[in-house]
Structure formats: C-alpha cells, structure tokens
C-alpha cells in the first residue's frame, strides 16, 4: 500500500512564521519579568550555542545567579512547547485539507478500505477488527493539567492563524488573545508542587475524553461504517476503536491503587459519558420541535412522551421533545445512581434529592443549567415512581432506536443525521463507560497471597517452596475439585491479601452492575511459569470470577525479560493444554491475550535483542494458537521512546510479523505521549485513524519479503542479536563503574523526586540497575541526551557481522530495502541517534566524581560513533532523518533552545550536589526536566 507521508507535507513556512510570532511574545513576557538585561542574557546563551562554543556557553551559565536561572529555565522550557503546538496545528490542518481534496496521506482510512475491499473476507475483517489504545499513568507525563489547558487555548488560536492572514479574523484581537495566553503561561507554575494521587490521574485522563476522545472516536466509528456502506459491505456492529485504561487498576508496584480507586475509575467514567449524553439529548430536545399536527409518531415514541416529566402545556403537541425529556430524566437518574456509588441499593439516586445541584466530575463544575433545570423534575418523577434509571446502556440505546425508527417510518429520516446520529454512534461505542479497565499485579504478590490462603486452609504449609510441578498440581486440584473459598476461614489475613481480595470483590461488583466489558482482563507482571497464571485463577475464584467452566476476567500473562520471552512458547504450550483452560478460552470466543513487555526486555538485553526476541515470540505464540484453534491476541506494552518500544505507530504495526494480528490488537499509550496524540480532537482523530489503518493494512497485506530470503534474514539476525546482547550486558551489568556512572552522570535522582506520577520510581530500594523501573531508566538517558537504551550494542554487533565476510554489508542493505521489520528497527535507531548529543553527554559525564566512573563515557562515545557509521551505511544515507524531512526540520527549530536547557540543567545539578540551591530553587531542575522532555516529544 503506497501512501504519501503526511509529515513531509507540513508547511514549514507557516510553522516558521508562527514560531517567530510565539518567540516574539515569549520574549516580551520574559522582558516584562526579567528586564531587558535578563532577556539579553538568554539571547546570548542561544548565540553561544549556535556558534558551537560550548565551553563559553558552560562558563556563561556557571556565572548566572540562581535568579537568572529562574527565567532562563522557564524560557527554554516553554519555547519548545510553543513550537510543538504550532506543529500540531499544522498537522491537523494538513489532515483536514487532504481529506477535503481527497488527497492521500499515511494512514488515510478511505484508502485502506480500498485495499481491504478487494479481500475475499473483507466483511469478516471489517466486522471484527478492534484496535484498543490503553491509556496508562506511567510517570512520564510531566506537564500539569493547567499547562495542558493553556496549551489547548493557544492551539485553538493558532488554528485561526490562516483565517487571520486571509483577513477573516481581526488580526489585532487575535494577536492580543495570543499574547495574553503566552503571558499567562510564562507566569504559571510549570510543574506540580505535590505528587499526583491516583484519583488525580483518573480525573486528569478524563479530561482527554471530554476535550477530544469522545468526539474523535465517535467520528471515526461513523466514518468506518460510512466507508463500509460505500463499498457495499453490510456490517452488524463493528468496533474499530475501543479504549482501555490502566489508571485505577494497575497496582503493580503502586501501593496507592486500591479497591476504592478501581471503583472510582469505573464510576467517574460513567459520570463523564452520562454528562455527555445528557448534553446531547438536551440539544435534541431543543431542536426536535416537530408538531403532532404535522407529522406522525410511532406508538412507542407516543408512550415515551406520555411518561415525560415535562408536562408543560406548550409541549402537548411536541411528542419528540417530550420523548427526549423522558430519556433525559432517566439519564439524570442513572447519573445520580452512579454518583451515589452504592450499587447494592437501587434507590440510591433518590437519597440525593436534598442536594440537587451536584458537582460534575468531568469538569469540576456544577452540572450544567439545563441538567439542573430538569433534575428537580426528574427527582419529583422518581418520588412518584414514574421515572426509573437505565439499568443498562442497551435500554438507553433501544429508546434512541425507537425514535430513529419512528422518524424512518414517517418520512422524517433527514432528521437522523447530525446530533442524533452522533449520539446513537456514541452509545454504540461507549455504552455507560468509556474504557475497559485492566487490572495488573506482580506475580510475586499473587504467589504470596495464594501461599497464605493455602496455609490458612490447612492445605499446604510451604507452598512457595514447592517445585513448579507440585505447585500446578495443588492449584489445579483447588480449581477443579474444591468448591469452597479458601478465604472463608477465621484466620486473620495479611494486609496484602486483604487488599487483593478487596480489589477482586470490587471488580466483580462492577462487572455485575456495569457489564462484563468494564473489566475484561487481569495482567500478571513477570510471568515466569504456568503456576503464576493459576495462582491468579485461585484468587479470582475466591470472589466468584472464575469457576471450572468460565473465567469472567481473562488471565493475561506479561512476558517482560529476554529470558521470559524466550520461555513464553513453552509456558503457553503447557497452559493452553489444560482442560480447564480450554473451557475458559472457549467461553471467551476462543481468544487468549498475551502481553509483551518492550521496556523491561530492552533494559534487560538492549534494543536489538529486545526487538528481535519480541518478533520471534509473536511468531511462535501465534503458531501455538493456530495449532489449537485459538486466536492469540497481543497486547503491546510500548512506551513513548524507542528504548521502550516506541517510534512511529503506523510503521510499528505494519512491521509486525504477518499473521500475528488476527483482528484485535491492544497497545499502551504511555503518559508523555497521551497529550501529544490526544490533546485535541484533530490530533486524536488522526492518530486513531492511523492505528486502525495500520492494523487493517497488516491484516490484509501479505509478506513482501521472499520466504526463502526470510529464512536467511532470520539466521543473520540470530547471530547479530546474540552479539548485541553480549555487548550491551557487558556494559550495563558487567562494567563495575557503570552503576555509579548512571547515577552520577544523569539526573536519575532528580527524576525520581519529580512529582510526575503516583507510582514510585522503583518497586524497592535500588541497589543495582535491575531494581530500577524501566521508565525512569529510559527517562534519565533521554535527559542526558545519550539515549542509550535505543541504540547501544547495535553498532558493534552489525560491524562484527560486516567485517566477518565480504558482501555482508550488501546483505544488510538488501534486508533494509526488502524487510519491513528490519527497516522499522533501523529507522528507529536513526531517529534516536538524531536526538542524541554527545557534546552535551560529555558535560553530564563531568558530573561523575572519579576518573574511573567518567571513563565509562568513552566506551559509550566509541559505540555511538560506530553505530552512527554503520546505520548510515546500511541505510545508504549521508545523514540522519533523510526519510523524515519534517522531523529533521522540527528538530532544527527546537534544538538550539532545549539543548541550552541541558547545559542549564547540568549547572543546576552541580549546585544542588554542592548544596548551593534552596528548596525553592531545586524546582528549577524539575522545570528543565520538563522542558527537555517537551522538546524531545517523547521521554520515557
């Protein structure tokens, strides 16, 4: 499938003009705060960097006072953010323009449909495809919610820039508005003073649904159906995009996730979508003024009108309005029910009648006036037992369908399009909650809980000491033969066990009241054996979520390390062979999900080893499923950076092994990229469209690489990857000075103290690299600009292969030209190297206290230079990013500013370690961390 890359069409002239305007406004705001001399100092730093005089730049920064640092840190943090906004606006403009003139671009859904429609099984593909972005709260989203809101204001103003240029909008007013928001941004705290709580993370992510995701997903789903009809393909209920969420349910290493946060995550979702429905229904109420004197209505709609709490004489002859009033009153009752949160009492809504003006969780403000106006009517109707709440979203959908059918039957079909059709589509996609919530916990916690249960029930005293075979035998017996619940004994339970059981009980409650889809899977971190999966089954059995025939929550193994990925084939062979598992899967539509960990496998073995091991594991696991008639679906735990599986989403999906995407794919969207991808409705639509198009493309496009050649390619990769893994581990785990280098020559200590998420930086006290979470590990290498997880070990391994035999370079060049996986792998390394900077990294190395520790940098530098030479040789390129001119131009805009910020950060770290910063001034380091992450556009 051939597409023009959208990013190559960006209007650099417009972006350059906008950046000039934004820089001028930021200069003015800085001048007002720091004075002319303060702004001159900042401009001098940029001049020194442009001249390449890094020693003079370092000296100038060292002479700055801490007060000078305040304004410089803010300036160099905010300018890259403003550049980002301009680029995002231009991207949205290009998407809309190309859609309107029917021009192709990468990931355009209509062109993907052209290819899919030619397949013999086009209908099955389109009916069943399901892409699930899963929003996580990993601690890499460093911007405050307030800053995100200011960003959106500036985004909306820049969207009007072309109209300003065309004279359609008053230039002076537009400029004044833009100036005001830049001024506010310059005077707003960039970072959080306190660490986020899980509750804050939940409410923050809800804002993305309010501002963009509900609209974008609804629009995309509607477009998907429209294109199918256009191709003459009749679909029943396609769900090309549904959302997932970890926030509130992911307790792996986060002690602050509890049964209450799980419940809050579910109920807040319901309140957000219900508020959306109530507003939409109110719009329909206002517009559907059809008179019964002039049009007919169905009996069903007439009955709804009779039940309406709107008894005004002025609406006696307006049955549709009264029907919508009836629907809205039921929605309000449903909202009140969820706000009460007491799912065991169906009259919970009525108890809120004394406090009618309720807070709207989606906005933090009161329920809108139109809701308030009808709340009292609705509650009065409840007291008269004439209006109930909707027990299911299906019941709400049925009422809307009744109105739709009435319109169709009475020649009023033209009224269905617009708001009504949009509402109907939203209900079909979301129901009464926005996203499926995943639960996740580490396998060691499950084992400890099961061991405690078995001991308290006098079954096994020393479960953890049993062999794997013995463990599986004990667990299977309990699952298949023992109907009792082990936790029913009177023996006191540990706090950990109590918390785990409470979460599982809440999960069952939510599924019982909100539906099966609200919580569908539980992920087991560090899955290393079959017993790890059966241990979770035992805990789910305790609350009635698992029995001998059915698992209401699917057990999803997460294979993370290189060793676990290599063993995943044998583990799943054994697991899928048990009769009880076969029955569970049969009752789950023959799907078994497996999660793949990109972050930890990279930290464990390096970029090449991680990428290749993941590739092979997918092939092997898919084959196991096919042998057993099971659809293996993969959940890709990818981060924002290449070091954590990131990179361009379209290329990442289309380079997956052919056949490994059956129809469903899930992938994490990590903290720092959520704002970039889904911060506004245009960006959200484009990124979701790309995910769906890429998935469809990979499902229908056969392997373009010659099968015989592919065998040779795999043998070459096996050899190179083994070498790369050894080189990487020799440095990271074998060099005696590496640990000290990482902790002294990067801002890892400062990153760990940054208030960017609710979760600790490590599961326990860090004594070695293996104890550190993958996210702060990658985040810190991004900050010191080495980007080590995205490339180290690549250059030497390829170079050894090239030098081993004449013609090997040509083989690698051929692989790059003909094998999508290999091309994507190397293109990501190219991108990472383009964002790295060894001059800056050298100055970070000087933060290390001893010469022995500083010498680690020389090893890294040699490998960086070798990797650069080898990658460019294989690509046949002269420089980085030759195939991504827009990204190259983008870096050209921003590098001078956030590179200076690195030098400022280095000086601040020096002062901090010499105890020359006050507590307030320490926050400046956090501001620089924020600015560098913003400039890179992906950080952890």
From Swiss-Prot:
Its cofactor is Mg(2+). Disulfide bonds: none annotated. Its EC number is 4.1.1.31. GO terms for biological process: carbon fixation; oxaloacetate metabolic process; tricarboxylic acid cycle. It catalyses: oxaloacetate + phosphate = phosphoenolpyruvate + hydrogencarbonate. GO terms for molecular function: magnesium ion binding; phosphoenolpyruvate carboxylase activity. The active site is at 138, 603. The keyword Lyase applies. InterPro entries: PEP_COase, PEP_COase_bac/pln-type, PEP_COase_Lys_AS, PEPCASE_His_AS, Pyrv/PenolPyrv_kinase-like_dom. It is an enzyme of class 4 (lyase). PROSITE patterns: PEPCASE_1, PEPCASE_2. One of its GO terms (cellular component) is cytosol. PANTHER family: PHOSPHOENOLPYRUVATE CARBOXYLASE. Belongs to the PEPCase type 1 family. Forms oxaloacetate, a four-carbon dicarboxylic acid source for the tricarboxylic acid cycle. This is Phosphoenolpyruvate carboxylase. It comes from Streptococcus thermophilus (strain CNRZ 1066).
């Amino acid at each position: 499938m051939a597409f023009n890359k959208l990013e190559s069409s960006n209007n650099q002239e417009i972006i350059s003009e906008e950046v000039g305007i934004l820089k001028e406004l930021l200069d003015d705001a800085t001048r007002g705060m720091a004075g002319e001399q303060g702004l001159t100092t900042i401009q001098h730093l940029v001049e020194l960097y442009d001249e390449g005089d890094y020693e003079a730049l370092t000296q100038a920064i060292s002479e700055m006072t801490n007060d000078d640092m305040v304004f410089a840190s803010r300036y160099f943090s905010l300018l890259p953010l403003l550049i980002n906004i301009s680029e995002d606006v231009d991207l949205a403009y290009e998407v809309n323009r190309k859609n309107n003139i029917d021009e192709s671009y990468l990931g355009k859904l209509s062109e993907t449909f052209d290819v899919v429609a030619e397949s013999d099984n086009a209908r099955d593909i389109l009916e069943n495809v399901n892409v699930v972005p899963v929003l996580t709260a990993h601690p890499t989203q460093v911007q405050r919610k307030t800053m995100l809101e200011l960003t959106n204001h500036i985004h909306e103003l820049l969207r009007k820039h072309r109209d300003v240029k065309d004279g359609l909008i008053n230039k002076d007013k537009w400029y004044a508005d833009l100036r005001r928001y830049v001024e506010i941004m310059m005077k707003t705290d960039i970072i959080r003073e306190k660490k986020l709580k899980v509750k804050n993370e939940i409410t923050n992510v809800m804002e993305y649904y309010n501002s963009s995701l509900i609209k974008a997903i609804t629009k995309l789903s509607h477009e998907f159906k429209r294109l199918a009809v256009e191709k003459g393909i009749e679909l029943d209920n396609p769900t090309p995009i549904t959302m997932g969420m970890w926030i509130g349910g992911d307790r792996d290493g986060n002690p602050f996730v509890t049964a209450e946060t799980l419940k809050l995550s579910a109920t807040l979702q319901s309140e957000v979508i219900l508020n959306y429905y109530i507003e939409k229904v109110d719009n329909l109420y206002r517009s559907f003024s059809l008179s019964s004197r002039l049009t007919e209505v169905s009996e069903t709609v007439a009955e709804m009108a009779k039940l309406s709490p709107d008894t005004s004489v002025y609406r006696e002859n307006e049955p549709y309005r009264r029907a919508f009033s009836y629907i809205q009153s039921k929605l309000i009752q449903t909202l009140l029910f969820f706000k009460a949160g007491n799912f065991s009492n169906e009259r919970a809504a009525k108890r809120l009648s004394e406090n009618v003006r309720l807070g709207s969780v989606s906005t933090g403000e009161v329920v809108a006036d139109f809701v308030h106006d009808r709340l009292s009517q609705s509650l009065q109707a409840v007291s008269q037992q004439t209006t109930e709440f909707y027990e299911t979203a299906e019941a709400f959908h049925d009422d809307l369908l009744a109105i739709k059918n009435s319109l169709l039957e009475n020649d009023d079909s033209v009224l269905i399009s617009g708001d009504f059709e949009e509402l109907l589509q939203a209900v079909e996609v979301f129901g009464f909650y926005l996203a499926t919530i995943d639960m996740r916990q580490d396998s060691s916690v499950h084992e400890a809980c099961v061991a405690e249960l078995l001991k308290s029930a006098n079954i096994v005293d020393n479960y953890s000491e049993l062999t794997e075979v013995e463990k599986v035998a004990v667990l299977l017996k309990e699952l298949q033969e023992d109907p009792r619940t082990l936790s029913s004994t009177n023996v006191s339970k540990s706090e950990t066990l109590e918390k785990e059981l409470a979460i599982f009980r809440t999960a069952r409650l939510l599924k019982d009241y909100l539906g099966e889809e609200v919580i569908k899977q539980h992920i087991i971190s560090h899955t290393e054996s079959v017993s790890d999966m059966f241990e979770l089954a035992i805990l789910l059995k305790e609350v009635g979520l698992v029995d001998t025939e059915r698992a209401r929550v699917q057990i999803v193994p997460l294979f993370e390390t290189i060793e676990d990925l290599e063993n995943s084939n044998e583990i799943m062979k054994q697991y899928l062979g048990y009769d009880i598992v076969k029955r569970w899967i049969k009752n789950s539509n023959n799907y078994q999900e497996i999660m793949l960990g990109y972050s930890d496998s990279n930290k464990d073995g390096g970029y090449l080893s991680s990428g290749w091991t993941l590739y092979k594991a997918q092939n092997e696991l898919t084959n196991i499923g096919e042998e057993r008639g099971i659809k293996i679906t993969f959940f890709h735990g990818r981060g924002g950076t290449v070091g954590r599986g990131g990179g361009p989403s379209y290329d990442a999906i289309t380079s997956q092994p052919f056949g490994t995407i059956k129809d469903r794919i899930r992938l994490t969207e990590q903290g720092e990229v959520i704002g970039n991808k889904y911060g506004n409705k245009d960006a959200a639509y484009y990124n979701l469209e790309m995910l769906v198009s890429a998935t469809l493309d990979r499902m229908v496009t056969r392997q373009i690489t010659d099968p015989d050649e592919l065998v040779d390619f795999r043998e070459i990769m096996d050899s190179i990857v083994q070498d790369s893994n050894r080189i990487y581990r020799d440095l990271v785990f074998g060099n005696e000075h590496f640990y000290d280098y990482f902790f002294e020559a990067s801002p890892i200590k400062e990153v760990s103290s940054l208030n960017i998420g609710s979760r600790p930086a490590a599961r326990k006290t860090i004594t070695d690299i293996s104890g550190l979470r993958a996210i702060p590990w990658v985040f810190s290498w991004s900050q010191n600009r080495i980007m080590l997880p995205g490339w180290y070990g690549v250059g030497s391994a390829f170079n050894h292969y090239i030098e081993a035999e004449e013609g090997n370079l040509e083989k690698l060049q051929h692989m790059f030209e003909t094998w999508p996986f290999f091309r994507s792998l190397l293109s990501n390394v190219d991108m990472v190297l383009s964002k790295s900077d060894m001059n800056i990294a050298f100055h970070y190395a000087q933060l290390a206290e001893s010469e022995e520790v500083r010498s680690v940098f020389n090893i890294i530098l040699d490998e960086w230079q070798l990797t650069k030479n080898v990658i460019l040789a294989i690509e046949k390129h002269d420089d980085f990013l030759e195939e991504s001119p827009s990204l190259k131009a983008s870096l050209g805009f921003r590098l001078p500013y956030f590179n200076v910020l690195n030098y400022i950060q280095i000086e601040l770290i020096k002062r901090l370690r010499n105890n020359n910063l006050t507590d307030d001034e320490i926050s400046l380091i956090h501001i620089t961390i924020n600015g560098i992450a913003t400039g890179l556009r992906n950080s952890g």
